[in-house]
């Protein structure tokens, strides 16, 4: 079973051209969205149209024996309490945003905020996905982080542009390759019913360009809907202009799991060094869980004791460090390369003579001699 839009994204231009002709679609703009819309309108014979068009099954690599399109409710349905009847039906939240909207006025009043301001939270969300896949990219239970930024209705355009820029900067700050990130505007046919404008931050995975975060102008839709259902005002009083109004919202919504997958996929590197394969996780030093590993070259001649003292001093300075004394020094380097540790410090025979150690860079594998008493200062500069 496939989501139609995802299935079409994996088709060749020739196949898309064929189905466009069958459905009498002239424009190539937002082509997949238009094809999906047309297939839904021709729901009763959509399977035949897909077969006639030569839509390929990604698993078999052959034209699929397609059924007619069906629409699904992606919300998780459940029952509260011991009695399983219509009165106990509930749905797991598909997004974290609605809790923010319900509590908007409470947060605004108790924290004495003035517009514009944002409320952010992180938590579990659930979607009954038609098909899961690509490891943790698409799952039915996931961690979501969302920010609802409340502002005057006539200022949403400028704030949408502002948050698009800020969110792109955030992904860049994680060390993710800039050439593999893009900001894609939604076409009119793609927009959600509550949104007047939306942008997706996308990353180019091995399986193609896919969404990491959506930034949308939700207008006053959500607060309006909650007011209609509850008969309670969710308005803001502007003391300067002496007026009440419903704030508009610019939303930034990202999946934590997808962000983590992006960081790992972007950092994972396999390269050949001196005829040997090397696997390295090129994490940005600022997000690497361990910043530096310390190795005694040998487990004798006071090298372990000196190494442990260096580790303790580094930890006491607030830098995450790791002590590794097992195996050859080459294997220890490789272990830390795979774990994404940016720097390695080796205590060797010269250390016993001149109180210096070797500092190794993970990415370049270059080494330099530095004095033990300058280790922390040098690490702070590099990090």
Predicted regions located by residue number:
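NTP/phosphate- and nucleic-acid-binding module
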Residues: 1-383
């Amino acid at each position: 079973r496939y989501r139609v839009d995802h299935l079409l994204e994996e088709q060749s231009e020739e196949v898309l051209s064929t189905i466009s002709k069958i459905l009498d679609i002239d424009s190539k703009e937002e082509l997949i969205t238009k094809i999906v819309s047309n297939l839904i309108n021709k729901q009763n014979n959509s399977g035949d149209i897909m077969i006639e068009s030569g839509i390929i099954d990604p698993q078999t690599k052959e034209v699929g024996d397609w059924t007619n399109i069906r629409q699904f409710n992606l919300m998780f349905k459940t029952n509260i309490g011991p009695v399983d009847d219509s009165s106990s039906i509930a749905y797991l939240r598909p997004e974290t945003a609605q809790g923010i909207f319900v509590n908007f006025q409470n947060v605004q009043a108790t924290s004495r905020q003035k517009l514009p301001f944002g409320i952010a939270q992180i938590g579990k969300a659930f979607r009954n996905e038609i098909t899961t896949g690509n490891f943790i990219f698409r799952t039915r239970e996931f961690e979501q982080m969302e920010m609802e930024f409340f502002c005057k209705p006539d200022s949403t355009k400028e704030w949408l542009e502002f948050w698009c820029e800020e969110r792109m900067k955030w992904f860049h700050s994680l060390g993710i390759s800039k050439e593999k990130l893009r900001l894609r505007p939604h076409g009119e046919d793609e927009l959600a019913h509550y949104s007047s404008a939306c942008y997706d931050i996308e990353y180019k995975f091995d399986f193609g360009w896919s969404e990491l975060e959506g930034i949308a102008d939700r207008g006053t839709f959500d607060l309006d809907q909650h007011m209609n259902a509850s008969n309670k005002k969710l308005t803001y009083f502007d003391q300067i202009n002496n007026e009440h109004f419903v704030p508009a919202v610019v939303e930034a919504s990202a999946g934590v799991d997808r962000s983590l997958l992006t960081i790992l996929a972007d950092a994972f590197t396999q390269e050949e060094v001196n005829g040997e394969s090397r696997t390295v996780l090129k994490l940005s030093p600022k997000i690497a869980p361990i910043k530096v590993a310390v190795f005694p070259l040998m487990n004798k001649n006071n090298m372990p004791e000196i190494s442990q003292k260096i580790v303790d001093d580094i930890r006491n300075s607030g830098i995450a460090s790791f002590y590794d004394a097992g195996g050859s020094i080459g294997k220890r380097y490789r272990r830390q390369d795979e774990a994404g540790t940016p720097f390695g410090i080796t205590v060797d025979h010269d250390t016993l003579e001149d109180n210096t150690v070797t500092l190794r860079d993970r990415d370049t594998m270059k080494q330099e001699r530095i004095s033990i008493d300058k280790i922390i200062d040098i690490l702070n500069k590099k990090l």
